[in-house]
């Protein structure tokens, strides 16, 4: 075998870049799903929708760093904490926590589907 017959190819960086890209897309899709589920959770007892302001304020963002991708589901409505955690006179409606906890298997499946290709 001569040197001309021997070829080594390195695809490490390209492979890692592709995995990072897929992970970022997967987290974006999972974040959109979680945002939707959080809005739906407000319909569950104890239901507290008057104007829809809280529901309409729920959004998601993502943070992407090498090897670390995060979806953040949040609201900027000042009374959201009282609805979520409850008060002395009002039972909690943990719409954010429930949106995450009740759908973990779906989020996992979304992420796996993007990374398995």
Where are these regions (language model features)?
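Short, Lys/Arg-rich flexible segments
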Residues: 1-117
């Amino acid at each position: 075998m001569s040197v001309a017959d021997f070829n080594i190819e390195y695809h490490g960086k390209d492979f890692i870049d592709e995995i990072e890209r897929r992970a970022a897309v997967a987290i974006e899709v999972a974040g959109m799903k979680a945002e939707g589920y959080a809005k739906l959770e407000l319909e569950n007892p104890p239901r507290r929708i008057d104007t829809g302001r809280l529901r309409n304020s729920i959004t998601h963002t993502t943070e992407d760093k090498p090897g670390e991708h995060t979806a953040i589901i949040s609201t900027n409505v000042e009374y959201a904490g009282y609805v979520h955690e409850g008060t002395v006179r009002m039972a909690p409606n943990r719409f954010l926590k429930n949106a995450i906890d009740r759908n973990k298997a779906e989020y996992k499946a979304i992420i796996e589907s993007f990374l398995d290709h």
